[in-house]
Amino acid sequence: MPTIEERVQELADKDEIRELTARYCLAVAEGDADELVALFCPDGTFVTGDRQYSGLAGLRELYGGLAAGVPPKPFIQNHVIEVDGDTATGRCGAEIRMVRKGEAYTVAGHYADVYRRLDGRWRFLSRNFMTYHAVPLSQGWA
C-alpha cells in the first residue's frame, strides 16, 4: 500500500502532466513554436500517421509553420495517466478544429504519450497522434 507521501506525489505528478498537455494545446492554438518545442525532451518525438519528427530540430520543423496561417484549436479530454518514477505514460482524446486550404475541418483522435521528468519538470518524450476522422466541418463526421 502506498504511503500518503507517495500518493500525494503521484497526484502532484499527474496534475503537472495534465498541465503540460493543456500548455501544449494553448501553444498550438497560439502558434507558439518556441513554447511547443520547450515542452519536449531534447530527444523527443512526435508521430502522426506515417510522419515522425524527432529531436528539437524536427519538432521545430513540425511546429514552425503554425503561426503562418490559422493555427489549429485542439481540445483534450479523458486523460488517463500512469506514473512510474520519473517516467509516465498517458492517453487523452482530442478534438481539433482547423483550417485546410481555406476550409474548416473537424478532426478527432487520441494522443498516446510518454512523459519524462527532466530537470524537475515533466516533458513529452513522445506524442503519437492517432486520427479517428478528419473531415470538412460542412460534411460532419458521421
Spell out what each predicted region is:
Residues M1-E30, D34, A38-L39:
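Short, low-complexity N-terminal intrinsically disordered segments enriched in polar/charged residues
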Residues P2-T3, R97, L125, T131:
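C-terminal-biased regions
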Residues R23, G58-E61, H110:
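Alpha-helical elements of Rossmann-like donor-binding domains used by nucleotide-donor carbohydrate transfer enzymes
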